[in-house]
Amino acid sequence: MNFNDIETMVKSKFKDIKKHAEEIAHEIEVRSGYLRKAEQYKRLEFNLSFALDDIESTAKDVQTAKTSANKDSVTVKGKAPNTLYIEKRNLMKQKLEMLGEDIDKNKESLQKAKEIAGEKASEYFNKAMN
């Protein structure tokens, strides 16, 4: 074997090793990106859990207010004040009912968002590990 043959063989092996190293570096970069995305989705899921807790607390407060609104705690002598009180109480009940419905819708939306964030976190984590 002469020097040129050896040189050609070494250069060929170096190119193969360099190509393989570039492929590995690219794979590491891609998987690192997946891990970053998985971490971001996990953090989002965690934050959405707190938001859900806040909404559930608010929903309980609204439910308590609705229950309290149904109780007649004020008695006013005379027809006009009673009518005004009843109208305002009914308006308050209606607004509390609407608020409760909005809270339920928001709660459902947050729950879906939390589930999707959890699924995405798992998806990207699995991509990074496979």
From Swiss-Prot:
Organism name: Staphylococcus aureus (strain MW2)
UniProt keyword annotations, A-Z: Secreted, Virulence
Protein name (record): Type VII secretion system extracellular protein C
Primary location recorded for the protein, binned into one broad class: secreted
Cellular localisation: Secreted
Protein family membership: Belongs to the EsxC family.
Keyword hit for Secreted: yes
Complex and partners: Forms both homodimers and heterodimers with EsxA. Homodimerization is calcium-dependent.
Function in brief: Implements its pathogenic function during infection.
One Gene Ontology cellular component: extracellular region
